[in-house]
Each structure stands twice: as C-alpha cells, then as structure tokens.
From Swiss-Prot:
HAMAP family: Nudix_NudL. Its EC number is 3.6.1.-. This is Uncharacterized Nudix hydrolase NudL. SUPFAM superfamilies: Nudix (SSF55811). One of its GO terms (molecular function) is manganese ion binding. Keywords: Hydrolase, Magnesium, Manganese, Metal-binding.
Amino acid sequence: MISLSDFVNRFQLQLPPPPKRLSDNNRHAAVLLPIICKPKPTLLLTRRSATLRSHAGQVAFPGGVADPKDKSIIATALREAEEEVNIPHQKVQVLGQLAPLNSSGGYLVTPIVGLLPPGLSLHSNPAEVAKIFEVPLSEALSLSSYHYLDVSRRGQQHRVYFYWYQQHLIWGLTATIIHQLAQQVQV
C-alpha cells in the first residue's frame, strides 16, 4: 500500500515521460485525476451516462473539452470536474500534470493530478455522469493489475490497457492514464 505522502513525493520527484506521437490539432481537453486524501487514499472515477453520444456508460475521469474562456488547461479540468461531480475548484490542490495523450476522438487530453480533502459532498450531474465511485489508490497504481491488447486503428498499432475493479471495467484512455501515473510513481 502506498501512503499519500509517498505518492506525492514520488509524483513530484519524477518527470512525466515524453509525449508519444501527439496530434497537430487544436482540439484540447483535460481530465482531473482526483485523489481523495483518506488514511488509505482513493482515486475518484465516474461511469458516464448511458445517454451520452460518445463513450456512453464507460468509466472515465471527470473532464472534457477546453472552453475558450478557460485560462489554462488546468482550469478546464477543474471546471469540468465541478460541472460533472460537484468538486469545488478551490478545494483541489493541483500537484501537476501527466504527459498529454491523444484520444480516439481526436482530442489532445492533458491529465491533471489533484488532491481532494475527504468528506466533500459530491453528486453527479445526471446528464453526464451515472455513477461516482472510488478505487483504492494502491490498487489503481499496481502495474500487475493491468492487461492490454495491441490493436490496429487507422493503420497504426495502439496498446489498449484494461483492468477490472469490482464490477467496473476500466479501459482505454482512462486505464492508459492510470497506467502512465503508475509507471511514473513506480509502486
């Protein structure tokens, strides 16, 4: 099990890996990786609403597309987290960010890592989020939990990570982001 202080120290001492084959588009998005500061820290995830046009019913971090009014990509992640699951932006202690990743939808997604105090009154925006749940941070960061498939998409090979947590299949970009974080802190 990793303690919160060990996680923070490892995260802040390691540079994120260099980005891989980033797209040249201007479609930017951000997600918040909310780590809840409990005695046994947890990582907050959501199950997207079944009525959404894209990625319906999938497990995801709170986040979304950058708005022209956002002052930074961090502001995008914080705004989206507040809209989707009622995380007050002033309650998030931003630790930093991981290397941006290309999404299958053509966005350049920047993962923002932030700490949350325990006991926040979170509730989902039902138009976007069907469920909020937490995964023990030590389990999410265990590299041995991950499996992967190598798939070909648009003529390029992609590694798709996945793992199960209880009844939740965590896969695709979300699992790739967690896997990237796990590699960075090497639990």
